[in-house]
UniProtKB/Swiss-Prot annotation:
UniProt-recorded name of the protein: Tubulin alpha-1 chain
Main localization, broad class: cytoplasm
Swiss-Prot/TrEMBL catalytic activity: GTP + H2O = GDP + phosphate + H(+)
GO cellular component: cytoplasm; microtubule
């Protein structure tokens, strides 16, 4: 078996996690108490969904995941929520006082006390696997726990499980919508560690997903539940081929191989189509070509970033439902002829496709319509550089005046860490510029030292 362990850190990580496990359970027909009437092999078996769920002798299915937060309220919602019987109590770990939006608290003072407990639980989950293929890590980098404890845990996972893949689903601060003043500090400090310790990071931001909810689903005032259910669809599409048997299956490590041209350039855009409300879906059924085009629309991106400002390096299309390879090839061929969608000249093929025959599932009473086919795209574009430039600019404005820095230093950080992280991101911006540079020959000389 190729098992995957999910790690949900901080409020954002946990709430996205809730939405994901809710959706997985619906997709596999697992009840909130972990029973699965359709499952004939009791106690394990080689069903594809065992990559994400382990089975007890009593036929209960337990998610292979942990929820981790420095304060109890969010984890308590899981402990008392609909799916409280699904999780083993040891999988839900919470501390007493939160990180207070402070990276240093999450990474040094408070995070340090809880991280060993978390690693201990992860070790138990890992021992329960026959062939662990990697970790999915869910966090946001604007707050204190997701950024500080998140990066601390990733660093420790690199030490303990060096060769295993780590995929991050990371919520970045949005350009306009802000939840904390010190977001730029936390995200820069955290990205510094993500650069080294994740293999692929899929970037998300709330503002982009708010806009999608407003525009495509006609939700006037989207809540986090609306956003998280949308994110869950994306993550479900990515992991569908690990959980179901399909025609063109995609392994976690395959994402890495196909999407990451250079180790540092591993931050991905994601999009999902079709996003339509139930009222509209009643009147239209979308073809493979239409949903493929929709996935490339700048407005479909789950992070505020316009791919037209850069070039694609690689792109992974995961189809599910009623889709055959012939349609996919035709759609991809059409995309390649479009002038607006440009690839770098050193990557001529650029597409990796996966097909899974399990049609998309929707949460009953949710916003999304039940459709016959859907596609999720993860792409590596040079335009992602603009997200980092935006963050760095905000960081610089504050750091020039050393505003708020004393809070971090007071928790045991050194000022040198700020400048080190900032220099690392400056180098990253430069990497993006070089990769997008016009010709492959010109870039060749400069890149010799770098990689």
């Amino acid at each position: 078996m190729r098992e995957v362990i999910s790690i949900h850190i901080g409020q954002a990580g946990i709430q996205v996690g809730n939405a994901c496990w809710e959706l997985y359970c619906l997709e596999h027909g697992i009840q909130p108490d972990g029973q699965m009437p359709s499952d004939k092999t009791i106690g394990g078996g080689d069903d594809a969904f065992n990559t994400f769920f382990s089975e007890t002798g009593a036929g209960k299915h337990v998610p292979r995941c942990i929820f981790l937060d420095l304060e109890p309220t969010v984890v308590d919602e899981v402990r008392t929520g609909t799916y409280r019987q699904l999780f083993h109590p040891e999988q839900l770990i919470s501390g007493k006082e939160d990180a207070a939006n402070n990276f240093a608290r999450g990474h040094y003072t408070i995070g340090k006390e809880i991280v060993d407990l978390a690693l201990d639980r992860i070790r138990k989950l890992a021992d329960n696997c026959t062939g662990l293929q990697g970790f999915l890590v869910f966090n946001a980098v604007g707050g204190g726990t997701g950024s500080g404890l998140g990066s601390l845990l990733l660093e420790r996972l690199s030490v303990d499980y060096g060769k295993k893949s780590k995929l991050g689903f990371t919520v970045y601060p949005s350009p306009q919508v802000s939840t904390a003043v010190v977001e730029p500090y936390n995200s820069v400090l955290s990205t510094h560690s993500l650069l080294e310790h994740t293999d692929v990071a899929v970037m998300l931001d709330n503002e982009a997903i708010y806009d999608i909810c407003r525009r495509s689903l006609d939700i006037e005032r989207p809540t986090y539940t609306n956003l998280n259910r949308l994110i869950a669809q994306v993550i479900s599409s990515l992991t569908a081929s690990l959980r179901f048997d399909g025609a063109l299956n995609v392994d976690i490590t395959e994402f890495q191989t196909n999407l990451v041209p250079y180790p540092r350039i591993h931050f991905m855009l994601s999009s999902y189509a079709p996003i339509i409300s139930a009222e509209k879906a009643y009147h239209e059924q979308l073809s493979v070509a239409e949903i493929t085009n929709a996935a490339f629309e700048p407005a479909s991106m789950m992070v505020k970033c316009d791919p037209r400002h850069g070039k694609y390096m690689a792109c992974c299309l995961m189809y599910r439902g009623d889709v055959v390879p012939k349609d996919v090839n035709a759609s991809v061929a059409t995309i390649k002829t479009k002038r607006t969608i440009q690839f770098v000249d050193w990557c001529p093929t650029g597409f990796k496709c996966g097909i899974n025959y399990q049609p998309p599932t929707v949460v009953p009473g949710g916003d999304l319509a039940k459709v016959q086919r859907a596609v999720c795209m993860i792409s590596n574009s040079t335009a992602i550089g603009e997200i980092f430039s935006r963050l760095d600019h905000k960081f610089d404005l504050m750091y020039a005046k050393r505003a708020f820095v004393h809070w971090y230093v007071g928790e045991g950080m050194e000022e040198g860490e700020f400048s080190e992280a900032r220099e690392d991101l400056a180098a990253l911006e430069k990497d993006f510029e070089e990769v997008g540079a016009e010709s492959a020959e010109g870039a060749g000389e400069g890149e010799g030292e770098e990689y």
